[in-house]
Amino acid sequence: ASLAGDTGRGDGSRRLYDWLCRHLPDCSCSVLVFHYLQPDVDWHGRVLLAIEQMTRPPVLIADAGFMYAAKMSGQAGRYDCFTPDLGELAFLADEQAPHPFYTRGFILHESNRADDLIERAYRHDNAAIHLLVKGATDAIVARGRVVDRVDAPSTPAMEAIGGTGDTLTGLLAALCAAGHDLVPAASLAARANRLCGALAR
């Protein structure tokens, strides 16, 4: 894990972007997960160029800020998986929004219609090859088609709130690193994350 403190001014994110650009070409990891980095289209592009220099292309997973940068730069299709909640999915679905703050209201109000948002995100090339959409019912999507849904066990306090998506993304990355294909890894991660929530009660 590579960590850098950032209080919102972007200093830590820029330090981490720079570190990634310098070290990724020599990295031999099989999975790369990008999470809470301040979105920066220029730095995002530099990181992708560094990844291209790696000996073996890793599985690329993005959540939160880095997912935003991927969409904003028109590079969403370079990623193997995004892990959005419904609010983040609404941003991916809005082909005109340059930043989540500008997601159009009528799209935000469709947040209970995940399938429509998924279709729209893929139609405008703003989605990764796979999506693991977090919500009351998690949806696993491959190339625009929902291939699995996970809704049990249900722990309402865990549904798409801060922190639960982090554990889900971590489980997905660990399973991919262990050699699982992405779709079964996403299904298993969604189920395991829900079980963790139920057991933690």
Short names for language-model regions:
Residues 4-8, 86-88, 153-156:
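Short, acidic/turn-prone active-site loops that include or flank metal/cofactor-
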Residues 194-201:
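Charged C-terminal helix
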Residues 151-163:
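Short pre-catalytic strand/loop immediately N-terminal to key active-site residues, enriched for Gly-Thr
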Residues 91, 161-191:
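Short, small-residue alpha-helix embedded
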Residues 143-145, 149-151, 171, 175-176:
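Short, contiguous, well-ordered secondary-structure segments
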Residues 3-78:
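Ribokinase/PfkB-type carbohydrate-kinase core domain
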Residues 70-147:
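Conserved phosphate/ATP/ADP-binding segment of small-molecule kinases
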